[in-house]
Amino acid sequence: YEQGPRMLLNLGHSIGHGVEVISGLAHGAAVAVGLIAAFGLVSRRARSGGDSAAGTSIERTAERVRAVLKALSLPLTLEDARLTASAATSPAAFREAVIEAMTADKKRRGADMLFALPRGIGNVTIEPVGLEELAGYVREAP
């Protein structure tokens, strides 16, 4: 797996690879879904930690990124990915399959995954995210 600054290139890939494996989407399209999901995870963490200002800031940045991806006709949500998947499945089954695929990720470290978390344009941190937290987010994300 990548180490050091190369890890920043994993932004969008942790969830994106799970989406790619399950949906059959092209790599870039799946990473677009993962990128938007990563912004959502950061926003959720900020708000659950009581930092609504940080949540609002990251949501504004996510809207900018979302607008660019939408202009490129890329899928933006897990539901978008499910609807374009090569095999029809229920929303819950699709999300559980994505979670299962994510647990095989090379960035997994026991009960955590090293995750590239966007903090703003050009600002990404690498942090461990618990698999349970990640699974909970995937189950509830748009």
What do these predicted ranges mean?
Residues 1-24:
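Oxyanion-binding "anion nests"
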Residues 4-7, 11, 31-34, 61, ...:
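Residue-level detector of well-ordered alpha-helical segments, enriched
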Residues 5, 23-31, 55-59:
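Active-site metal-coordination segments of metallo-dependent hydrolases
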Residues 13, 35, 121:
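Residue-level signal for inorganic ion chemistry
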Residues 14, 18, 30, 124:
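Gly/Ser/Thr-rich beta-alpha loop segments that engage phosphate groups in nucleotides
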Residues 18-22, 38-45:
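Active-site catalytic microenvironments for nucleophilic, acid-base chemistry
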Residues 28-42, 65-71:
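An active-site-proximal "capping" alpha-helix that borders the catalytic cofactor pocket
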Residues 48, 52, 56-142:
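C-terminal charged capping/lid subdomain of soluble metabolic enzymes
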